[in-house]
Amino acid sequence: MCHAAPARPEGARGRPPSGDNFSGAARSKPVGAAFEQRARQFLERHGLGFVAANVTMRGGELDLVMREPDGMLVFVEVRARRSTRHGGATASVGWRKRRRLVAAALQFWSRHGAGAACRFDVVAFEAGRLAWLRDAFRTDDA
């Protein structure tokens, strides 16, 4: 199956402080979509083909599903943080999140990619920089 590898002052519009991440109900979806689009473009420039985005399966959501030229499915989690404090974007993919990603990926894989190898990557935006972690974790890590 799958394997291979401080608060700030209020904003100009009177918004409450958002901390050091990009969370916030009013902004989370558009901000997340923008980072997912940037991640997709980056991965496409590096030879991966787009398969699907924001796939909701029982147990979790897959931000991006891509395909390597050799046919391998790549399940991509996109994370963004303003700073690397508290571990940054990469560290925010903890064991609970990995477990949900694996559950969703197994369902997607069984419906759309059975027989293809697959892996889990993370594209992290931390303090304005993009980091691509290929084979960030495996199914037995979750």
Curated annotation (Swiss-Prot):
PANTHER family with a match to the protein in the record? UPF0102 PROTEIN YRAN
Organism the protein comes from: Burkholderia cenocepacia (strain HI2424)
Transmembrane regions: none
The record's Gene3D superfamilies line, in alphabetical order, gives:
3.40.1350.10
**GO molecular function terms here?**
nucleic acid binding
Low complexity compositional bias: what residue ranges?
1-19
Identify this protein by name.
UPF0102 protein Bcen2424_0290
NCBIfam families, sorted: PRK12497.1-3, YraN family protein
Report residue spans for region: Disordered: 1-27
Family to which this protein belongs: Belongs to the UPF0102 family.
